[in-house]
A protein has these predicted regions:
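Soluble cytosolic regulatory domains appended to membrane proteins
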Residues: 2-160
């Protein structure tokens, strides 16, 4: 058969293999999704800023933990003066561990004292490239910024 010359040939080969029962449906879909991801930008997959959950930096550990647990997310952006000023990421496990180990910290310490650095990515970045970077650097959540540096949204490795 020789080498495949382009993406279309590989897609056709996968379709043929699927039709003949050589490739499972989920594998077939995954291969097609890989090709489609190559043309996809981060802005198309992100959670837009209007749908984001965040914690204000001056909230107590108890308040931050309560909000994060109610949201169902394990990582939540922490904002300073507003949504365009993200100062880090709060991990529920960090907040919970601190609150359990030091009960007084629940009400005396602020969320901003327990944030991890945020990763920022441009909204016009290719999703496939970001996926590789997130996998390589073990990043689960990134802040998506628009061309003016404002917060456009967030993206998780699961979104990609």
């Amino acid at each position: 058969m020789g080498l495949l010359s382009d993406e279309d040939e590989l897609r056709q080969l996968m379709d043929h293999a699927h039709t003949r029962g050589l490739v499972e449906s989920d594998e077939h879909e995954m291969i097609h999704n890989v090709f489609e991801l190559g043309d996809t930008l981060v802005r198309e997959l992100m959670v837009p800023r209007t749908d984001m959950v965040w914690i204000e930096k001056d909230k107590t550990l108890r308040q931050g933990l309560s909000l994060a647990l109610r949201s169902g997310y394990s990582r939540v952006p922490v904002v300073g003066d507003g949504i365009d000023n993200i100062i880090g990421i709060a991990y529920v496990k960090d907040l919970a561990k601190r609150a359990l180990d030091h009960h007084e910290a629940e009400t005396t310490e602020k969320v901003e004292q327990h944030t991890r650095p945020a990763v920022f990515v441009p909204e016009n970045k290719e999703a496939a490239e970001l996926l590789k970077e997130m996998q390589r650097d073990q990043i689960h959540l990134a802040i998506v910024v628009d061309e003016y540096g404002g917060t456009a949204g967030i993206i998780t490795i699961e979104d990609i």
